[in-house]
Amino acid sequence: MKKEKNNIPHDPKKIEKELGEFLNKKFGGNVKIITPSVLPQQETFSGKPFLKKNKSLINFNIKPSELIAYLDQYVVKQIKAKSVLSTKICTHFNRIRHSQTMGNGLSKITGNIKSNILMLGPTGIGKTYLIKLIAKKIGVPFVKADATKFSETGYVGGDVEDLIRDLVKEANDDIQLAECGIIYIDEIDKIASSPSVIGAQVSRTGVQRALLKPMEETDVNLKVPHDPVSMMQELESFQKTGKRAKQIVNTSNILFIVSGAFSELSNVIRRRLSRQNIGFGSKLVQSKKENELLKLTKAEDLVNFGFESEFIGRLPVRCILDTLTQEDLYSILKMPNNPVILSKRLDFNAYDIKIIFTDEALKIIAKRAYEENTGARGLVSAIEEALLDFEEKLPSHDLLKFTVTKKILEDPKGCLIDFLAKKNALKWENIYEKALLNYKDYISKYINDNKKIFSIRHGLTLSQIRCDMTALYFCNNVMEIEDALSKIKKVHDSIKEIEIEVLKNYNLNIIFEEDAIDFLIEQFINHNATNQEILSKIYDNYYNGFNLIREKTGKDRFFLSKNALIDNETYLNDLIRKEIT
């Protein structure tokens, strides 16, 4: 087959003419392209890309254990999956960083192998959620796509190379950054060619083959053939530079992660194992559950499932996720950062209603979700079905607090009537306060149990008091634990800034002791105090006394405790008596 010649004209007028002819054929009518008359610049930029190709190094230094600890805050179970994903992803990007740091001093390996990842597991167990969390944490460009939306070039559907172009957009047109991104393709099992299906095989196999080179290493042209926008960009670039712009992305460092439910793969594995075992061993194979069989997956099983051997060969890392039990679903609901409860809190918060769930209620929701047999997705359905009537009625009444109890889930209509009766307001208020106290204690314990990680991450010493304050702030505001800790850290830093302001404005060196900082954090969080208010009180309550001591003794450094802030007169009298008399 002869290689196509590049017939794109270099003359702007010819480009303009061809673009006009293309648009006429495409849209009909007389379409005329009018471009500004701009002469090419005197200097030529041979091969210079139209998009940015920054030389900044990738800033990645996360260790696998750090990423696992982060995922543990959001994902229940999946210990093996979190380990595999964290290790291989961190190694991939740290290897890129190390290579860029070494520069030319590190020779490139011929036949470099990427650790592309294949994730297998039933629907609703958190495959997509895991990858989204990782992408958010590591901060590299990330693109997610559905395998069923793509086709081999020439068939109906998206071109797989569009994924690379989308990655460049996510990187704000920084090609070098895009070359260190992640492409995640879900429902990859849907492009496996099935022996029992006739007709769709060519397209499915074609998509697999189209992915082969990008998954390994290839250069992808960002310009799309026969695309009017690309042609206009070509014209604009030529008019500015006098040269054709090269817009090429190399995929050697782009990590591909694919996932699927693979619902029929267990049967393929069972047949293979049955052939290898006869008699009693064969009966044991038949009794194995689907998830147990998936953990025995081999390359030949995936080939028999309908994948090309070359395609599977480019996915050397396999990650099998566990199915979720009823207890796992309950644990998900108990996690502070779980999106199911946070989302429902946001729903009611939109009407200025604070909602809280008792432990018994969460267990019932988990049981109902497990019966749905759709994994963690069943949690959303169970909560929506249980609370829809309350979400409809409560916004129309003057009610600002709502507690989801076991009784409410078992008798929603009766409880709704009881809840709306004004005579029962105090009863439900007490139920809410009790549930809030229990939830706050649970969150505080969670923070305290993980305070070593949180303290390092936020640069904040977490005493029991600060754990309690963070927990209360989290309970009263819809946010993740990390955001609540960031708020406490921000307030803590603003208090330390007050010390600097006092020194700068009044030439007094005051130092807040830890209990004083905790007291001030509480004022900021619960009473909306401001830096200026605190600064003014420091001047009004302490300046004259501190200034007197400084004039008499030369001392200009003073420590303020919580008691000193609460009872400034007693504190100053004792201090003056001690320092002067």
Can you say where each PLM-predicted feature lies in the sequence?
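Non-catalytic accessory segments flanking P-loop/AAA+ NTPase cores
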Residues: 1-581
